Amino acid sequence: MEPLNLDNLKSMLKSPDESSRKLALGILKANQKKIPKKDLVRLYKLVPARECVKSYKDVCIQLGIEEVTLENYSSIPEKERSRALNSHKLDNITRRFNGRKVTVKENRYMPYFIKEAAGWRFGVSFCWYSSASYVVVGFYFKNEEDSDYCGKTFIDIYSELLG
């Protein structure tokens, strides 16, 4: 079998042809353990996050970072570990989806959740545009579609953070 040609894979991922991009993404996912980490991160940057992120593990692979667990937070009080871990996860998720830090000079979207007897559920994404400071802690996205996707896909992480 011929070695994987990263330049060809890169060209396919940049292709305007959707079937070529889907094929390249399939090849990328199937071979990600064989591709050097820095090349893998570069290739995944070419793919919109909504097309290739289905889990927090995907986020870690695509950012080239190790997946952390509660054990990584053993130095802080036990009751604060889950919140710290989930906050860390959401920070990485927003970093993967935004590709950068969203600034105060642009629209920022944040998923909102509704508390019901059965638990939290995704409600809507809210656009936040202001240079004023508010006491809202949020993990902002640069567009509503990514905010909606993450609010629904990562509701378990948000639920644990919200309590």
Regions found by a protein language model. Name each.
Residues M1-E2, D156, E160-G163:
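Short intrinsically disordered terminal tails
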Residues L9, A24, L43, Y56-V59, ...:
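Generic structural signal of hydrophobic/aromatic residues within well-ordered alpha-helices
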Residues K142-S159:
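A short, charged, amphipathic alpha-helix used as a generic interaction element across diverse proteins
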Residues K34, G119-F122, D146-Y149:
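Short, surface-exposed beta-strand/loop "edge" segments at domain boundaries and coil↔beta transitions
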Residues V104-V136:
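Short aromatic-glycine-(Arg/Gly/Cys) micro-motifs in beta-strand/loop hairpins
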Residues M1-L43:
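Short, low-complexity, charged amphipathic interaction modules
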Residues Q32-K115:
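The feature represents the first ordered module of a protein
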